[in-house]
């Protein structure tokens, strides 16, 4: 059984053995990183965190021809490309084009409560005038959802984000609009 006492005893034994061998603690903050890797020494976040504190909450739509696309908080702020390197603005453009090809309209909302694609899709569907929504994670995973289904009982899930291309995203938009 592993417990706190055992962890402390092992830690003390390792430290005692290191001290007995003459090993001295070293400051690794200035140690050069392995070739090809960047050093994090003295670095802070690349960009400051984005605050949505004063953001206006999305309202439920009334247009029966509306499909809402729900994206996560990090979408195009912290993360700008899918896992396969496709720019998120292109992904959105293609999903919207697919929706428009079927004669429907689209609206994009940020879902700030969750990063789970199923819940993002459900929230988008609840905000949509048609009751159909698309959840889109920054990594590219996509789901088509309907407002009266359970969160994980979506209409369609596209988990193969690394294999998806822009044509696939366009087809997802078309499929959601049918």
Predicted regions, residues:
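Protein-protein interaction and targeting regions used for scaffolding, dimerization, and localization
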Residues: 1-48
């Amino acid at each position: 059984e592993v417990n706190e006492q055992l962890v402390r005893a092992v830690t003390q034994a390792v430290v005692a053995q290191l001290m007995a061998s003459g090993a001295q603690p070293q400051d690794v903050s200035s140690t050069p990183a392995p070739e090809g890797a960047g050093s994090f020494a003295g670095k802070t976040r690349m960009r400051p965190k984005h605050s949505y504190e004063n953001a206006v909450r999305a309202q439920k739509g009334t247009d029966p021809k509306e499909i809402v696309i729900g994206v996560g908080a990090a979408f195009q702020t912290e993360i700008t490309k899918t896992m396969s390197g496709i720019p998120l603005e292109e992904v959105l453009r293609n999903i919207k084009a697919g929706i428009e090809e079927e004669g429907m309209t689209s609206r994009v909302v940020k879902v700030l409560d969750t990063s789970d694609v199923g819940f993002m899709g459900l929230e988008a569907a609840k905000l949509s005038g048609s009751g159909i929504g698309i959840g889109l994670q920054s990594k590219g995973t996509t789901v088509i959802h309907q407002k009266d289904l359970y969160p994980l009982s979506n209409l369609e899930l596209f988990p193969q984000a690394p294999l998806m291309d822009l044509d696939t995203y366009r087809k997802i938009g078309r499929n959601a609009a049918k």
